[in-house]
Structures are given as C-alpha cells and as structure tokens.
C-alpha cells in the first residue's frame, strides 16, 4: 500500500525514472518485468515464446499482486499491465498511479534496439502506431501524468516527487446508478485534482466557487496546481458561512457562470466547507439543467458528510435546506492537509458527524474512536486518515444503496431533527452544525431510551464520546417557542407528526420513528434546560 506505480508505453522511461525516484525518496524500486523473469527463471522473450502473450499476462497479474504487497515502493509496471481491468483496480487501491508519456517519434528513437521486447520485433513505428492509442486512453486515467520528452530522468523524478500525495491514499467508490464516482482521501491532493479536471474538462471552461475564508488559504495552491497541468480556471467567491446559502449568493454564482461562458460541458469546482458545497452543488444542479461539478471540501464536516451523497440546497426564511436538489458530483477530493489550519471549533464540529455515522452503522468504528479520540483531537495524521476513510466508507455505502433517501439513508439524519431545529431557532450561522447535531444526538439518544427503542450502553457511549470531543461544553441558548416552531417545520415531519431516527444499539439505528410530542418536549426540556 501507498506505493507509486509507474505506467506508460515501452520506452517512456519507467525504469530509468523509477530508479531515480526511488533514490530521491529512499524507497525500494521494483521493476515488474525483472520480477516476472526472475520468478519464471526465463527472460520475458522466452516466456512469450513458450507460453504466448496470454501466459505472460497471467504471470504479469500475479507478479503485480505480489509487488503491490510492498509498502512505499516505486513499481515500474509493464506497458500493457494496466490494460487488464483487474490489474488497474489493484494498482489504484491505496496507491498512486503515475503515467509517463512520450511522443511516438521519441518512443521509436528510444526503442530502435528492441532487445527483450517481444511485441516490438516487427516495424517499430507501425507497432507504436497500432498499440499506443488504445494504451494511451488508459494511461491518461492515471492520478498524475508527466511527459518525458526532452527531459532528464532526475528532473522528471523531482517533479513527480513534488506532486505525489503524502502519507497514504484511499479511494472509496459511490456506486449511484448512472452517476458512479469516487472519493479520494489523502494528503497533498491538489495535483490529483488538477489531473482529474484535465481529464474531465479538456479545453472546456472551469469555475472554482469558494468563500472568503477558504479562498484565503487554499485557492492559490489549487490554481497553481491547475496551471502546472495546463488548466486555467475562473474563481468566484461567495460569503463565508450560512450567508453563502442565501438566494442572493446563488444569484451571483449564476451571473459568474454566465460571464465566464460556462456551458453544458463546463465544470464547476466547489472549494470550501459545507455551505460552499451546498450552494455550488445547487448551482451546478440547476445551471443549464445540470452541469458537472467536483467537490473539494476543506472542513472535516464537509469531508465526512455534506460533500457525499449529492444533496445540494439553499436556505429560505422558512427553514434550512428547503430548496434543493440531488445532484451527484463527478469526483470528491478530501485533502486532509486542509485540516491542519482548520479552527479547533470547526474540527470538533466535524467530529460530531464522525461519531454519528459510527454510532448508527459500525460498532467497531465506535470502539476505534473510543481508543483513538485523543490522537484524533491532536490531529495525528494516521488517525485523521483512518477516521475520515471509515466515515466516508460508511456514508458512501449507505448512499450507494439508497441514493434518493427513500429508506436506509435516513439513518444518516440521526441527531438532525433537533439539530436543524436548534440551528434555525438560534439563527442560521450562530450555532455550528456539528455542535447542533451533537445536542440533537443527545436528545435522540434519550428518546431512544425513554421510548424503549435503545439501550443504556448506547446512550452512555454516545454521551462519553461527545463529551470527550468537547461538543457538549455549551448548551445552545434558544427560546422554547422558537425551537418548537422549528421542529414543526422540519422536512422529516409528516402530517404534523414528529419523526426521529432512534439509536437501537451501538452500530444500529431505526428511521421514521414517530415519537409522542409530549415525550419530545419533556426530553428537550431536560437535555437543553429549557
């Protein structure tokens, strides 16, 4: 895991650059063809002669599987290795794939002595012309792509090293019918975002939507990464916080999209927290009846919650998120480097959603959090990577099974019935979402117990985690009447009845539970001291 896999056509420089990169980074180097030959006790040419290409490809897949068991290695794959879908999936699982390219004439010059290359025994330029187009389509799906034309291996390896993700890389699939996409989780991902946009947009226009807070920290590095990939993008800023989700902010995005000539083939990039993602996603959902967008969340809350699932919305005076649409992004990149400068209160707010998703879906994750919460609060990098990976994987699985929230996905609303009501009663923007959800979870946990649906162990465990995370330090100050009115406006209420997600036990929740309003009110009064 966390290997760098070099792919590219014969003669693109994988072995030479790979050795340079290994020397530069202090990592072991593995040449896949050399490993295959050593295992077989024969040259690659002899394997082709004795077993044919099909036999060689089977050996190649086995050799790749063995090589990928290494940690932090530089692996030079064969030119045809990534063409097998199963090989490609293995390469991308926890590893960074880097493609090296060269012009056909340069490849022909480098390959003029094709010793040991069984597929190059005939006319070399013709062979390149026949094989390269199909292979190039796969190479360009790599995380990073570098041309080796006219550049020394040391220079290429330096550029690769500067752009590699750091400290591990995870990809989580969200298999929504007709809109499947991935969440990439790691550190130092701006260059991976740039390459993805290069694939998606080609020469089409791109606009980055951010807010004043995120832009001040993160826009310039992203734009620089885009420029290094040969991409230009317009930048449009919306107000920070919940003000980003007002109709007037949405209107300014529409105006900027028009001014920049963003058409149906254009791409919108959301760079910011949950509010930016919500309004930018809603703009993408409605501009020209829907354009593609990429989520680049910069807060923990957005990484583990709002960026996943395609929910987009703006606020109205009558309530939070009342005007919205489900519009899936084409990719999500959660760069944990952004969390290093995140305010402590914002980081803790994101922890509420991590605790929530563990409580409703994965007891082992709850156990992990109980042990590792101190490290997580200290922003230990391996702890952050593991927590975000697990939280994203849980939500991605739920969304894949229920993309339109007609059933199971409702469990992700645990704590949100009261949480959203608290946000509205306090005034949007005055109470952080995670803090509101934490208190909403406290209420829902008590309701679970008092209604006979839950267990004392679950409520105690929840309370301990929320308290240790610093999420219960200050009770929200709201008026009783305002809170009750907000509850009645909740989207999950039906025919005036209050419906809750209740915690059945650690790792399991029930949704759509109708609760006696008197019990709700009594519990609110006790938990919130109303």
Describe each region flagged by the PLM.
Residues 16, 20, 24, 70, ...:
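NTP-dependent small-molecule kinase module
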Residues 93-137:
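A glycine- and Lys/Arg-enriched "phosphate-lid" helix/loop adjacent to the NTP-binding pocket
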Residues 28, 32-92, 116, 125:
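ATP-dependent small-molecule kinase phosphotransfer cores
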Residues 13:
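Conserved glycine(s) of the Walker
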Residues 352-355, 453-530:
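C-terminal charged capping/lid subdomain of soluble metabolic enzymes
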Residues 140, 282-375:
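A glycine/threonine-rich phosphate-anchoring loop and its flanking beta-alpha core
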Residues 168-267:
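ATP/NTP phosphate-donor binding region
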Residues 368-481:
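Active-site segments that bind and position negatively charged phosphate/pyrophosphate groups
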